[in-house]
Regions:
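Bacterial Sec-dependent N-terminal signal peptides
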Residues: 1-27
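Basic K/R-rich, polyanion-interacting modules in nucleoproteins and related proteins
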Residues: 279-330, 422-434
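Aromatic-rich carbohydrate-binding modules that target alpha-glucans
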Residues: 101-124, 216-225, 320-368, 380-413, ...
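Ligand-binding face of N-terminal immunoglobulin V-set domains in extracellular IgSF glycoproteins
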Residues: 118-148
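Contiguous beta-strand segments within globular domains
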Residues: 34-84, 181-192, 306-321
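Short acidic/polar inter-strand loop motif in beta-rich domains
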Residues: 87-89, 133, 147-155, 215, ...
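Low-complexity, Pro/Ser/Thr- and charge-rich linker/hinge segments at domain boundaries
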Residues: 29, 162-185, 397-424
Length: 434
């Protein structure tokens, strides 16, 4: 009788905890996003290598670091938690005590003040997992940061994954099946060996997600095995796991304000006591031949060649981008696009057309560092309430030979269980598999 009462009490507690969690989740999105204007330069990735993919090994010793700047300067009480999600980035329904070892919420305790910078800010950072918050299950996770522990105003959300490696993945880049995509797209085939798993029905219990350059916005989700061969699941769809190759990313180098990069044609302090810079004009690459060079695949790093440490000694530079065109795009707007925009088309990163110089112009506050980016277009008549879809066809072009990173995530949900595990993960570079 005592065991029955305990089981009922535990189930009731988990139900109530889950209901409270779902109610709180209605105020934010389960994707990478910053919800307030005064937080800038949100970085999240492996500690010491924050530009890399945010992945943890279950039971491993590594950690992820989240860092950001608050330009309102005063010290604030930021609180964070993590939410376990299913393969589709919906709440898994697990209560926090089922996947957290320690406290469900914790304050961000590490902060420092900027110095030697015209733009004042407070720099915050945290590492996860830590001694107060451990992780006990693999899967998709959402890191949520609140401002004010009582009101729980969500200010930052970031996706990350925890992997419990139980299978091996083999992948290769192949020529696209569709003739019209041979010179512009990239296709990836892969197979997994699930010998170590007690899989009853691989078609239902195993699925995969494929990402390009850490982008969740254009990922290919819910891939079931196409064929089975003994203990292997083969994901060879011949035309389904295909991505536009794009072009190598453009760059902005603001690492030094004393000895500016050659593409910085002007740099000075303006009348508002802000550091500002102007970049050399750029143009469309849609019809240009492919040019190969080393890039960061859309990511950025904060680095300062003049002062250290870069996290608090770097200034914000109001950077002007000038995109020359023969004619304005009648049905599209132009946007800065990349990791710096959280891979979203955002109003605050729109370039405006200036007929006097036949160019789109944008001015954006960027912390000193090294940035990769694209210019993307999006329909001007798009529904303002719906996520805008970026296109690179008019601005950047697309080539099959472009160097890109691909990430394969393998999910496993045994029959009768309550959550999706991640049991396999691999990063593939196009240059390494040709």
């Amino acid at each position: 009788m005592l065991h029955i009462r305990f089981a009922i009490t535990l189930q009731l507690f988990l139900f109530i905890s889950g209901a409270m969690l779902l109610q709180a989740q209605s105020t934010y999105m389960f994707t990478n996003n910053t919800y307030v204007d005064h937080l800038r330069t949100v970085n999240f990735g492996p500690t010491g290598f924050e530009h890399l993919f945010p992945m943890l090994e279950l039971g491993g010793s590594q950690s992820l670091t989240l860092s950001f700047d608050d330009v309102q300067s005063e010290v604030k009480n930021y609180v964070y938690t993590i939410i376990h999600c299913d393969r589709n980035w919906e709440p898994s329904g697990l209560a926090p005590l089922e996947y957290i070892d320690g406290f469900e919420e914790e304050n961000i305790q590490n902060f420092d003040f900027s110095f030697r910078a015209l733009q004042t800010y407070t720099h915050y950072d945290l590492q996860i997992p830590n001694r107060n918050m451990g992780i006990t299950k693999s899967g998709n996770y959402l890191l949520v940061v609140y401002e004010d522990e009582e009101e729980k105003q969500v200010v930052i959300t970031r996706r990350f994954i925890v992997v419990d490696r139980q299978i091996g993945i083999s992948a290769e880049m192949v020529r696209p099946v569709e003739v019209r995509k041979i010179h512009t797209h990239q296709e990836i085939d892969f197979d997994v060996n699930f010998l170590r798993l007690n899989v009853r029905n691989p078609m239902l219990e195993i699925s995969a997600t494929v990402l390009q350059n850490q982008r969740w916005d254009n990922g290919i989700y819910g891939l079931s095995p196409k064929f089975l061969n003994a203990d292997k699941a083969i994901f060879d769809y011949q035309g389904k796991v295909v991505f536009p190759g794009g072009s190598e990313f453009r760059l902005i180098d603001l690492r030094s304000l004393r000895i500016p990069h050659r593409d910085v044609v002007f740099i000075d302090v303006n009348m508002d006591n802000q550091m500002e810079a102007e970049l050399a004009p750029i143009a469309s690459r849609s019809k240009a031949p492919h040019l190969s060079f080393i890039d960061f695949n859309g990511r950025y790093v904060i680095e300062n060649q003049d002062n250290s440490p870069a996290e608090v000694a770097s200034d914000y530079v109001y950077t002007m981008i000038t995109y020359k065109v023969d004619q304005p795009y009648m049905d599209d707007h132009v946007y800065l696009f990349g990791d710096i925009t959280e891979w979203q088309v955002k109003d605050e990163y729109q370039l405006r057309y200036n007929p006097a110089i036949s160019a789109y112009v944008g001015r954006f506050p960027l912390k000193q560092g090294y940035y990769n980016y694209y210019l993307a277009t999006s329909p001007s008549d798009a529904d303002p309430k719906a996520p805008r879809v970026p296109s690179l066809l008019k601005t950047e072009g697309s080539h099959a030979d472009t160097e890109n990173d691909y990430y394969i995530l393998l999910y496993y949900r045994p029959f009768g269980t309550r959550y999706d595990q991640i049991v396999g993960y691999i990063q593939v570079n196009t240059l390494q598999t040709r």
